[in-house]
């Protein structure tokens, strides 16, 4: 998001130093298949935004059974929690959690994520919303 070369370069430099081989910056457009493959190779997804951003990426990650860590002040966090979507975690608690256990548990909860998300984000949910809107 955004195209601020100084910030991007500064962040990439920091991440390479601190995260080393666990950091893979995406600097060019990836096709859908390549992007899905990239997410599938991730253990966890961290979205450290203060505002609503990357919603499609979050939904895709959850649909693939990935645990997603968000800031609790991000409006997406309480919304997904209220929807009953598992695999949403408070980024502020990441240091107190067993990431290996979370990853194993998240894969098992993938279907639950999909079911919870489809209640709100599916063709059927859209049609029901439109019918109610037009009543």
Where are each of the predicted segments found?
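Conserved active-site histidine-acidic residue motif and adjacent donor-binding/catalytic loop
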Residues: 25-38, 74
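Short acidic/histidine- and often glycine-rich active-site loop of Leloir-type glycosyltransferases
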Residues: 73-74, 78-84
């Amino acid at each position: 998001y955004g195209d601020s070369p100084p910030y991007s370069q500064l962040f990439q430099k920091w991440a390479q130093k601190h995260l080393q081989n666990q950091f893979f910056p995406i600097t060019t457009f990836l096709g859908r298949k390549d992007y899905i493959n990239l997410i599938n190779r991730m253990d966890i997804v961290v979205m450290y935004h203060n505002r609503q951003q990357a919603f499609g990426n979050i939904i895709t990650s959850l649909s693939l059974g990935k645990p997603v860590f968000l800031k609790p002040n991000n409006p997406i966090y309480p919304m997904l929690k209220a929807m009953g979507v598992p695999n949403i975690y408070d980024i502020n608690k990441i240091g107190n959690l067993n990431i290996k256990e979370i990853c194993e548990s998240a894969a098992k909860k993938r279907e639950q994520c999909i079911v919870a998300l489809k209640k709100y984000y599916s063709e059927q949910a859209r049609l029901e919303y439109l019918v109610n809107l037009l009543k």
